[in-house]
C-alpha cells in the first residue's frame, strides 16, 4: 500500500516533479515568489535555497505542501483498501444518517358490511427506521525535520522521495485502519448473529465440499434475487430483494485461490469481467468458521465526515508536526440482504426477530407480534412469548397477541424466545420488541 511519485503526479495532473513547487509558488504572494524562482529541470538547488532562505518562506512551503497538495493526493489515490468501493460518500459534520424502510402491507378480506363502518379507518404504513452515527474520530501525526527539507533539494529525485514519504507516512496508516474497521463490521455482524447463516462443509477440505459450496452459493444468490422478495435474508425481516449485479462476494484469499472464477461467474449468471468486480478478496475473517459473505451493495453504510490536514511549526525543536484527521460513520444496514457461509459448529438458530420491534399501543388495546426464526437446520422451532414490565391484566398469548391493561402506564418489553439447548442446559435465543403505552381517553380502548 505505497503511493509512488507517479501516483502523486497523476493525482495532481502534472508531468514533472518540479510542477509541484510551481503550483505552490503560484498560490503564494509576492514575498514567496521574490525568493523562490520558477522551478525548472535544472535549478533545483536555486529553488531549494530560496525556500530555505527564511522561516516564513519555509512555513508557507510546508503548509501548502502538506495541507493542500498532500490532502489532494490522499483523496485521489484512495483505492488500496479493497472494501473502499462500498463507501457511500461524504456527509457534513454533525449529521446522523436516518435510514427508513417501508415494508409491504397486509391483505384484508373484503366485507361489504364492514366497509361501511371502516371506510375512514386509518392504516398506518409499516415503517421501520435505523440511525447511523459518526463513530470514528481519529488522527495521524508525523514530523518533518529541518534537515529533511534541506536534503530534499539536493536533486529532484530527492524531492520526489521527500514528498512521497510525507504522504505515505499517514496515507498507509489511514488506509490500513479503514480496511480493518470495515472488516470488523463483517465480523461484528456475524458475532451478533445478524447474518442469515448458510451451513457448509469446510470448502477446501475436499473437491466435493468445494463443489457443494458453489452450489449453495448459487442457490442463495437466486433466492436473494427472486422478484417477489423475501424476509429471510436480512436481520430486520423486511420483505426485500437484491439484483444479481448488486450482490458482492467477500472471500478470503485462500478460498478464492481454490475456486474457478468462470464457474463462480456462471453461478451468478454474469460474465467473467463483470463478476470479478463483484468479488472482494481479503486476507481473512477473524471469526472461526466464517468462510465467505454475500452482501447487497447497500449493506455497508460507511461515510466520510471529515478529512483534514493541519500543520504547526515547533521553533524550539526545529521541526514541523502535521496531523491528518479522519472522521467517519462506520455502520451497516440491517435492511439489506446479507448472508454468511459458515463451516464447523453452527447454532441451530442464530437469531429471533420480533416484528414490529417498536410499537405504541393504547391502554386497553392490542398488538399482534410476529417472530421470524433464523434456523440453520431446516427445522421448526417453538417460540415462547412473554411480556415484561407490565401490570396486572397485561398479557401475551402463545401466538404473539399482546393485550394491554386499561390501566397500564409502563413501557413493556415483548420477548420471543427459542430454546436450542437441552433440558439440562438450556440455550436461549431471544428477540425483543419495545412497546410504549398511549393513554386512551375513549371508553373501552382501541386497537393500535
Curated annotation (Swiss-Prot):
<keyword id="KW-0175">Coiled coil</keyword>
<dbReference type="GO" id="GO:0046729">
    <property type="term" value="C:viral procapsid"/>
</dbReference>
<keyword id="KW-0946">Virion</keyword>
<protein>
    <recommendedName>
        <fullName>Major capsid protein</fullName>
    </recommendedName>
</protein>
<keyword id="KW-0167">Capsid protein</keyword>
<dbReference type="Pfam" id="PF02368">
    <property type="entry name" value="Big_2"/>
</dbReference>
<keyword id="KW-1142">T=3 icosahedral capsid protein</keyword>
<dbReference type="GO" id="GO:0039617">
    <property type="term" value="C:T=3 icosahedral viral capsid"/>
</dbReference>
<keyword id="KW-0426">Late protein</keyword>
<comment type="similarity">
    <text>Belongs to the phi29likevirus major capsid protein family.</text>
</comment>
<feature type="domain" description="BIG2">
    <location>
        <begin position="348"/>
        <end position="427"/>
    </location>
</feature>
<comment type="function">
    <text>Assembles to form a prolate capsid shell of about 54 nm in length and 45 nm in width, with a T=3, Q=5 symmetry.</text>
</comment>
<comment type="subunit">
    <text>Homohexamer. Homopentamer. The prolate capsid is composed of pentamers and hexamers of the capsid protein.</text>
</comment>
<feature type="coiled-coil region">
    <location>
        <begin position="107"/>
        <end position="127"/>
    </location>
</feature>
<dbReference type="InterPro" id="IPR003343">
    <property type="entry name" value="Big_2"/>
</dbReference>
Amino acid at each position: 500500500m505505497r503511493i509512488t511519485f507517479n501516483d502523486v503526479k497523476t493525482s495532481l495532473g502534472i508531468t514533472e516533479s518540479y510542477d509541484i513547487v510551481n503550483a505552490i509558488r503560484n498560490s503564494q504572494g509576492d514575498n514567496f515568489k521574490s525568493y523562490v524562482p520558477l522551478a525548472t529541470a535544472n535549478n533545483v538547488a536555486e529553488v531549494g535555497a530560496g525556500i530555505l532562505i527564511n522561516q516564513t518562506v519555509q512555513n508557507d512551503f510546508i503548509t501548502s505542501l502538506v495541507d493542500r497538495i498532500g490532502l489532494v493526493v490522499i483523496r485521489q489515490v484512495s483505492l488500496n483498501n479493497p472494501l473502499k468501493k462500498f463507501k457511500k460518500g461524504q456527509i457534513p459534520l454533525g449529521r446522523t444518517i436516518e435510514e427508513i424502510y417501508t415494508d409491504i402491507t397486509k391483505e384484508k378480506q373484503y366485507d361489504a358490511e364492514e366497509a361501511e363502518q371502516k371506510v375512514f379507518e386509518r392504516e398506518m404504513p409499516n415503517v421501520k427506521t435505523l440511525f447511523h452515527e459518526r463513530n470514528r474520530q481519529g488522527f495521524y501525526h508525523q514530523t518533518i525535520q529541518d534537515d529533511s527539507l534541506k536534503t530534499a533539494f539536493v536533486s529532484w529525485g530527492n524531492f520526489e522521495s521527500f514528498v512521497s514519504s510525507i504522504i505515505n507516512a499517514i496515507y498507509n496508516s489511514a488506509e490500513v485502519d479503514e480496511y480493518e474497521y470495515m472488516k470488523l463490521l463483517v465480523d461484528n455482524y456475524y458475532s451478533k448473529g445478524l447474518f442469515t447463516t448458510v451451513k457448509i462443509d469446510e470448502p477446501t477440505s475436499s473437491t466435493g465440499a468445494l463443489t457443494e459450496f458453489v452450489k449453495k452459493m448459487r442457490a442463495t444468490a437466486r433466492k436473494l434475487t427472486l422478484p417477489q422478495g423475501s424476509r429471510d435474508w436480512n436481520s430486520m425481516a423486511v420483505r426485500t430483494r437484491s439484483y444479481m449485479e448488486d450482490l458482492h462476494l467477500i472471500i478470503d484469499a485462500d478460498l478464492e485461490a481454490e475456486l474457478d472464477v468462470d464457474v463462480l461467474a456462471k453461478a451468478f449468471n454474469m460474465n467473467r469481467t463483470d463478476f470479478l468486480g463483484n468479488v472482494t478478496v481479503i486476507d481473512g475473517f477473524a471469526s472461526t468458521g466464517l468462510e465467505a459473505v454475500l452482501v447487497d451493495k447497500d449493506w455497508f453504510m460507511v461515510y466520510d465526515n471529515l478529512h483534514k490536514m493541519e500543520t504547526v511549526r515547533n521553533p524550539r525543536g526545529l521541526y514541523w508536526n502535521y496531523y491528518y484527521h479522519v472522521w467517519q460513520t462506520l455502520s451497516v444496514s440491517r435492511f439489506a440482504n446479507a448472508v454468511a457461509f459458515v463451516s464447523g459448529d453452527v447454532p441451530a438458530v442464530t437469531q429471533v426477530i420480533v416484528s414490529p420491534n417498536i410499537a405504541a399501543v393504547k391502554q386497553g388495546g392490542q398488538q399482534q407480534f410476529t417472530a421470524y426464526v433464523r434456523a440453520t437446520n431446516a427445522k421448526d422451532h417453538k417460540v415462547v412469548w412473554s411480556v415484561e414490565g407490565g401490570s396486572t391484566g397485561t398479557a401475551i398469548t402463545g401466538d404473539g397477541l399482546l393485550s394491554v391493561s386499561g390501566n397500564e402506564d409502563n413501557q413493556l418489553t415483548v420477548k420471543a424466545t427459542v430454546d436450542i439447548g437441552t433440558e439440562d442446559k438450556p440455550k436461549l435465543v431471544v428477540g425483543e420488541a419495545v412497546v410504549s403505552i398511549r393513554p386512551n381517553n375513549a371508553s373501552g380502548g382501541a386497537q393500535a
